């Protein structure tokens, strides 16, 4: 969903007062490093076919399906508890149904038991971002890039 939902509060770094608000807008207000944003709901492949690369950080199974079945280069970043991964358009298409499995396509960043404090917080979402940044750099430098990578911390 594009809106903060109650289920997001425990694992996507949102606060109770942000429940029901647009996720992109909340990110813009909360992070000084976000200089410009423009919510862009993706509903069809036609909307993204001109992009050089699509980076997916969605918790929406329909968006992932659209991307995985497209002919557009993409990178999907995921984090769940102490695990993180990236999956690229180069991954074996026969395995996409397995890669798309999960409850409503959601993959937690801090784990279901995260209470909002930083004590014992899992930082797998930061690891996923770092791995993704390296992959993107290599992709645009025309270096070899991996199909996927999974890390357990």
Language-model segment annotations:
Residues 1-153:
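Adenine nucleotide-associated cytosolic modules
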């Amino acid at each position: 969903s594009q809106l903060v939902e109650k289920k997001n509060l425990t694992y996507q770094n949102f606060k109770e007062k942000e429940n029901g608000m647009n996720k992109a807008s909340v990110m813009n207000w909360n992070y000084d490093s976000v200089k410009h944003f423009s919510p862009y709901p993706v509903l069809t492949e036609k909307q993204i076919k001109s992009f050089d690369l699509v980076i997916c950080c969605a918790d929406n199974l329909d968006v992932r399906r659209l991307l995985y079945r497209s002919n557009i280069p993409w990178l999907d970043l995921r984090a769940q508890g102490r695990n993180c991964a990236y999956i690229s358009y180069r991954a074996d298409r026969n395995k996409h149904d397995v890669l798309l499995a999960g409850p409503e396509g959601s993959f937690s960043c801090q784990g279901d038991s995260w209470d909002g404090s930083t004590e014992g917080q899992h930082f797998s979402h930061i690891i996923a971002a770092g791995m993704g940044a390296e992959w993107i750099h290599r992709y645009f430098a025309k270096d070899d890039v991996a199909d996927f990578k999974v890390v357990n911390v």
